[in-house]
Amino acid sequence: QEDNRMGVDVKISERTLREIYLRGFEIAVKEGQPAAIMSSYNLVNGVHAANSKDLCTRIARKEWGFDGVIMSDWNTTVPEDGSVAWKCAAAGNDIIMPGNAEDAESIRKAYRNGDLTEEEIRSCAGRILKLISQLA
């Protein structure tokens, strides 16, 4: 769906999400071992997918064992819609696209306020550096 793709809120049960919608991604991550994956614009049960620690960290990283880079889709951060850069980083996105000045300030402010930890920032940076070394 392209209409309202940044605002659509998919209301879905955990079972349906896992058995139908995430299954193909799980197979791709486990069998394909991609270096990077991209989070999406839409909301899932009221949370922007790029801001979802459940999707990006708990499922992709911990359950599926994904250790590569997670990046947001282009212009995912739309503060007036509730999707902000620091929440993307806290959820497990390593690269927030396109990486504008507002996104950088959002991350700095969240760090100063204690909403984003140094450990989370270092983890993101580490995965980016690992990807760079793999591609060099």
Regions found by a protein language model. Give the residues of each.
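Glycoside hydrolase catalytic-domain context in secreted enzymes
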Residues: 1-136
